[in-house]
Amino acid sequence: MRTWSTEYNILDMRIIKVNACHSIAEQPLCERAQTATIGFFDGLHKGHRKLIGDVVQASLRNGTESMVVTLDRHPSVLFCPERQPRLITTAEERIGLLAETGVDNCAIVEFNSLTASLSARDFMRRILKTQLNVSTLVLGFDSRFGHNRTEGFEEYRAYGREMDVDVRQDVALTNDGDVISSSSIRTMVGEGNVERAASFLGRPFSIRGVVVGGFQQGRKMGFPTANIRVPDDVLLPASGVYAVWVEIAGCQEVFQGMMDIGMRPTFNRCSLSVEVHILDFNADIYGKDVKLSFVSRIRREKKFDSVSELVNQLSEDEVMTRQMLSEELAPKRAK
């Protein structure tokens, strides 16, 4: 009996859930040979898309199916939760973005203590070769896997020869001379440089959350805001005011928004606030899921001497927001 192995379809991509406890004596999860790559793929940025595109093209030449092998959670969750990076994309977003690449299969490996204990050779033999029927493995320029990630491409290629797996290495993709990576995107977003992050991602950086109740300070000033609750492990941009696109669950229209992230120093608050003033909008959306796509940072967070001074600044921020968003195309809603 297979342990923790199920499948379902997202668009035309088959999802295969895999556990390291799968017995070698069992039938493989994939009958056809696979041309695959492996990684966590947080953000699914331009570099990831190039790698996966190369895998898809190689699979066509090889006469195999194409596959992405990924983990169900970031490895640091198990070993160093205090050092876990804030994620660019949630697991659901990551799988949805993978489905858009045209890859045939996505194998999601349950990351647990057994998986983490496997050497690179054992991972290739037990999971990639035996369970997933991988015949060609295309690795990213910095790809590392196996216990403690101590081995590299030459070792992987040698193990591949033992198992009749052709192991190849892709080249890095750069942007203005800088290598595109998830860690560099996290740094950019953390500094508020959402424009540069978008150039690495190939789309605006975005977050999702649920609209919850707040202190109503914005409404009292003439700038009502929707307070957004986001998952704790999601990456947030640096404090400040941003021009954003707002998508609301159940609504096909995409709205312009002025987003504020910060501690609300003018009101002496001590907790982080994530709220958006949706322009030309006045409806009750409490409890609704929203997606916020960041276009540009308007200004840094600032403490004002009075509420009236803050209101004047918000009026200027709104003018700037409208101007910036008028020069950008709104994202297309999925039908």
Language-model-derived ranges and their functions:
Residues 214-335:
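Phosphate/ribose-recognition catalytic cores of enzymes acting on nucleotide-derived substrates
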Residues 25-90:
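N-terminal catalytic cores of NTP/NDP-binding nucleotidyl/phosphoryl-transfer enzymes
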Residues 14-16, 106-109, 166-170:
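General small-molecule cofactor/ligand-binding pocket signal
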Residues 86-94, 118-124:
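Glycine-rich, highly charged phosphate/nucleotide-binding loops
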Residues 2-34:
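Positively charged, low-complexity intrinsically disordered leader regions
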Residues 114-224, 301, 305-311:
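Classical nucleotidyltransferase
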Residues 98-99:
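ATP-dependent adenylation/nucleotidyltransferase module used to activate substrates
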